[in-house]
From Swiss-Prot:
Catalytic activity: 2-[(2R,5Z)-2-carboxy-4-methylthiazol-5(2H)-ylidene]ethyl phosphate + 4-amino-2-methyl-5-(diphosphooxymethyl)pyrimidine + 2 H(+) = thiamine phosphate + CO2 + diphosphate; 2-(2-carboxy-4-methylthiazol-5-yl)ethyl phosphate + 4-amino-2-methyl-5-(diphosphooxymethyl)pyrimidine + 2 H(+) = thiamine phosphate + CO2 + diphosphate; 4-methyl-5-(2-phosphooxyethyl)-thiazole + 4-amino-2-methyl-5-(diphosphooxymethyl)pyrimidine + H(+) = thiamine phosphate + diphosphate
Binding site for Mg(2+): 84, 103
InterPro entries recorded: Aldolase_TIM, ThiamineP_synth_sf, ThiamineP_synth_TenI, TMP_synthase
Molecular function GO labels: magnesium ion binding; thiamine-phosphate diphosphorylase activity
Keyword Transport: no
Species: Actinobacillus pleuropneumoniae serotype 7 (strain AP76)
Enzyme class: transferase
Protein name (record): Thiamine-phosphate synthase
Residues engaged in binding 2-[(2R,5Z)-2-carboxy-4-methylthiazol-5(2H)-ylidene]ethyl phosphate: 149-151, 181, 201-202
Length: 218
């Protein structure tokens, strides 16, 4: 079993929609970026393949790509998480699944499988966090967006750099990963304020030098 707080140190999230490249197949580009990120030291990867320019309407191709990403993560002993798609996560033996407040409940996910899935839950308010804190099924909390972000078509209001500090002062003890518009210059402040780590998408997927981007975020 993975150490959850260590796992959250640098949490990379991506799908084909995040890896544009006019000269290559997006799936191959994702695999290339993921391997470079793994080599550079990311501590977790979440496969989040949805919306425009993704393989969402090609489930067989999406599943095949998810398996390739899982296998890469296994080579580097890095947890492989699937966003939202609980059935896929269970079918391909992912290490975990991440869901939002309006997705399948962590309680139901635990009832679906005997596998020790890591379960992450997205949060935007203190009320969300308190519900997560009290659910034994939730292993870690995603908290954000810290800043406005273009990676999601619809997102909650930004919470800022200091919100995680308020959460810790209010008594939230579960592992927290901060997400949403996070850049290298924000990492130290977020961790000082109580985040266990940061989650990023384009800070890595669109970086001109993936290895350097990862090292700056660690």
């Amino acid at each position: 079993m993975y150490d959850i707080r260590q796992m959250l140190q640098l949490y990379f999230i991506a799908g084909t929609q995040d890896c544009p490249n006019p000269t290559e197949d997006r799936s191959q580009n994702l695999l290339l970026i993921l391997e470079q990120a793994l080599q550079a030291g990311i501590t977790c990867f979440q496969f989040r393949d949805k919306s425009k320019n993704s393989l969402e309407d090609q489930p067989n191709a999406q599943k095949a790509l998810a398996i390739q990403c899982r296998d890469l993560c296994r080579l580097y002993n890095v947890p492989f998480i699937v966003d939202d798609n609980v059935a896929l996560a269970i079918e391909i033996d992912a290490d975990g699944v991440h869901v939002g407040q309006k997705d399948m409940s962590p309680i139901m996910i635990r009832q679906m499988t005997d596998k020790p899935l890591i379960i992450g839950l997205s949060n935007n308010t203190l009320e969300d966090l308190w519900r997560s804190e009290q659910m034994i099924e939730v292993d870690y909390c995603g908290l954000g967006p810290v800043f406005p972000t273009n990676s999601k078509e619809k997102h909650n209001p930004p919470i800022g750099l200091d919100f995680v500090k308020k959460a810790r002062e209010a008594g939230i003890r579960k592992p927290i990963v901060s997400i949403g518009g996070v850049k290298a210059e924000h990492v130290a402040t977020l961790k000082q304020n109580g985040a266990d780590g940061v989650a990023v998408i384009t800070a890595i997927s669109l970086a001109s030098d993936v290895s350097q981007a990862v090292k700056r975020l660690l």
